[in-house]
Curated annotation (Swiss-Prot):
Residues 22-84, 123-186 form the Sushi domain. The gene is IL2RA. InterPro entries: IL-2_rcpt_alpha (IPR015486), Sushi/SCR/CCP_sf (IPR035976), Sushi_SCR_CCP_dom (IPR000436). PANTHER family: INTERLEUKIN-2 RECEPTOR ALPHA CHAIN, INTERLEUKIN-2 RECEPTOR SUBUNIT ALPHA. Receptor for interleukin-2. The receptor is involved in the regulation of immune tolerance by controlling regulatory T cells (TREGs) activity. TREGs suppress the activation and expansion of autoreactive T-cells. The keyword Transmembrane applies. This is Interleukin-2 receptor subunit alpha. GO terms for cellular component: membrane. One of its GO terms (biological process) is immune system process. CDD domains: CCP (cd00033). Residues 91-118, 188-213 are annotated as: Disordered. Keywords: Disulfide bond, Glycoprotein, Immunity, Membrane, Receptor, Repeat, Signal, Sushi, Transmembrane, Transmembrane helix.
Amino acid sequence: MEPSLLLWGILTFVVVHGHVTELCDENPPDIQHATFKALTYKTGTMLNCECKKGFRRISNGSAFMLCAGNSSHSSWENQCRCISTSPRATDGQIIPKPEEQKGKSPMGMQSQMQPTDQVNLPGHCREPPPWEHEDSRRIYHFVVGQTVHYQCMQGFRALKRGPAKSVCKTTCGKATWTQPRLQCLSERSDGWFPDDEEPQASTDAALGSDTSCPSITASTTDFQRHTEVAMTTESFVFTTEYQIAVAGCVLLLISIVLLSGLTWQRRWRKSRRTI
């Protein structure tokens, strides 16, 4: 991985025209036999400039495209450019092969078709335009507030138990995705796949935990445990110091008594000799 991409990947916030936008920590959840797509992209969303095998980004080219703008107009900044890795190719020479792009969708899991009621949503960008020699799969980095929609793969039909979408939200101080309520059945079978009931249980569990903050509870419990351990240690130290102090006082008292006894004995002997 290139240093610029590594540094950029470590960041969890991105600045877009004076506004700080929080990136989602993870990718949208995977649903068995289903794919997801974003109809539009919130400002702050980033798309990696990936090239297909045999090509690479130009040395002075951008590592990603950025959806930037305001509530009235948003668009994709930067341009992705790929060149051949052949020794005869240079950074200033782009080798166009438009015939390779025909009939091929560069979206991977996402579709480029946009509904008419979503393309001009304020504060959002349309699907980024394709570039020459683009990789077959696009890698997005979404921001809080982004919504992705799910649909079953070809050969499967949807059994909706709720909204077939996922939204990136901030929960318990962490940007996470909500769990979509969607399950996909095979069109050639009236029954479930053997492994389809487990995802359903996990879906219900995930939905029930959206409003809870187990991490905070765990942190509080750990803090209480550390506090109790600290108090116990302090009590032990205090008890030990107290015992040492008492023993020292007893030794000092015994020493004083012995010295007093010796002094009195010497004086008594002197007075007896005088008599």
